[in-house]
């Protein structure tokens, strides 16, 4: 029997952004100034807060296809973040000089191109999780040190990697390793302030379970929630 029932979408949103934050902690440069978030949905919100847990930014630029949604997003969160939130008219201006970039859109075709990315940037690629879809162009994958959350999922679902592989631009050896291997010291992370690093997020079920159990334990310890009979 289950020990708890909770909203899985909220758990997934938080743990996804938390995983990106861990990757950012280990792969991004220590000294950063600008954060760029592409998207205005639930993951954009979660990443806005999670990124600020691991790095201090002087400016955060937000882009989305719908300008009204971008402004609504900024108005909703600007008083909760001690950093200037800026509306970006297009993707190019959003990522200009950005030190950390989070792509959290539903785009099936590339919206982000390598020519716009500064040297030393770190990217969290989150939005696309289907083999034939990608938010970024192949050059970004080729020019970056490419890290993943789970290798098996990457080889089946990471669109930007699989598209580049299908076009014979790279092979599996281009994957630097799983972020867990970097954390454990089994793989090297960033080795210079000029290289571009990418973290591909596809999600791992065990992360959801761990996050849900943490919420359950806290709810139980603080007498929060409702006891029901099944």
Say what each PLM segment does.
Residues 35-36, 197:
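Conserved beta-strand elements of the Class I
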Residues 1-32:
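Phosphate/diphosphate ligand-binding glycine-rich loop within oxidoreductases
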Residues 83-169:
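Rossmann-like adenosine-cofactor binding region
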Residues 53-78:
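NAD(P)-binding Rossmann-fold cofactor-contacting core
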Residues 39-41:
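Glycine-rich Rossmann-fold phosphate-binding loop(s) that bind the pyrophosphate
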Residues 44-45:
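N-terminal Rossmann-fold NAD(P) dinucleotide-binding loop
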Residues 27-34, 56, 118-119:
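Short helix-loop-beta connector
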Residues 133-230:
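Adenosine-phosphate binding glycine-rich loop
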